[in-house]
Amino acid sequence: MAPTTDATADESSMPGKTVGAAPDALFTLTAELGHAICAGMTGRAGGVSQGPWASLNLGDHVGDDAAAVAANRARLAGALGVRPVYLRQVHGCTVVPIDRHTPDGVPADACWTTDDQVACTVLVADCLPLLFAAPGAASVAAVHAGWRGLAGADGQGILEALVQTWPAVRSAAARRATVVWIGAGIGPRHFEVGPEVRAAFVGAHADDADAFAPSPRDPERWLADLPALARRRLRRLGFEHILGNDGTASWCTASQPSRFFSHRRDAVVFGSSGRMAAVIWRR
């Protein structure tokens, strides 16, 4: 079956019990992952950046004024009460542990921690953020999952690397008890990809074919349902409690310009786009 086609998104609300009005204006989405866990995702409002980065751009690699980015990051840290640790994301499969001594800029696309003084943080503007709370809230993790990292090579991507690297989820029982939240990302109506993207998934798992629909614009291209592909990978790895993004329009970054940054939407017009942060930390 083809992926669900987005309708026009209603930017005034987001669906599901896993999200709600955040207590701080910087957050567009909050994730309910347990009483000892704080987690959520920023939107584009609440910062000081101008132009295509207006206003809460948290990416320091997209051409925005460095002072504005620093001010935005300071606002986020103040809202959290802990330090967000920013990775240098490379669309790869590297997972690193972090603590209060970890500097920003470590090259990786996922991180985990047991330290309650830092927040696992990933930056996104169409790619999916995935936040994980391990059993007992003893450890948390954040993953940046674009199609390259999700697909990986020969079916071994960023989620497989997380399972192999993060001690809290190495056992099947722990994965069954872990809660995962998928944040906002580009929806299936807007994520047009080439045949090589489809092949990267279908070559490893033939049943992923129904997460792709032919593009009505180009017969040689496809519309990919990235949230569905992420959920399938998670279930194959034994994660059962998966909340958040279900691929419907109200979770789509590309269709909600007042709420979210979108690289695909904005870069073709402005030459750049801001970045949002998905964060998770232990109380």
Question: In which residue ranges do the predicted regions lie?
Answer:
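Active-site microenvironment for binding and transforming phosphate-containing groups
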Residues: 1-283
